[in-house]
Amino acid sequence: MLTIYTSGYSYSHKHCCALVIWFCEKYLPRHKIEIEVLHRGLVREGVYGWCSIQDCDWRPRSFLIEIHNRLSKEDYMKTIFHEMQHILQHIRGDLRDKRGIRCWKGIDCSDLEYSQQEWEIEANQRELDLYEEYLTENS
């Protein structure tokens, strides 16, 4: 079961939900998860979006995606898929936060630069694949 909440401004609720539902039905069909997508200006932060756990670090099931509200349609879709990939990584247990330490597949990766973080490398690679897959299936 999937529960989606959306909020913020300058976004399409219908489009946002369609992307999240598509991903969850395809890649997380048997998981009970709750996802809140908050649309807001992220200019000062210098990011398109990010994902955080809302409940516990062990077997998380509640997530918050914050996404920049002034992205092009293509960048918006890719960013949603990028952040959904992080949710998948958390649910699989590949990506974990333990007492302030970020672990990838059980290895402490807290000191790695952004470009060296395996979970970001994977999400960056997958966002384009997911974007193209979604367009192919929904055109």
Residue ranges, per PLM feature:
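Long, well-structured alpha-helical subdomains associated
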Residues: 113, 127-139
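Post-HEXXH active-site segment of zinc metalloproteases
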Residues: 74, 90-121
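Zn2+-dependent metallopeptidase catalytic core
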Residues: 11-32
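Active-site scaffold of zinc-dependent metalloenzymes
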Residues: 42-74, 91
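Active-site recognition of the HExxH zinc-binding catalytic motif
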Residues: 78-90
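Surface-exposed helix-capping loop/turn segments at secondary-structure junctions
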Residues: 27-31, 94-96, 134-139
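Hydrophobic or amphipathic, alpha-helical segments that drive membrane association/targeting
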Residues: 1-11, 33-48
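Short, conserved alpha-helix that lines the donor NDP-sugar binding/gating region
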Residues: 124
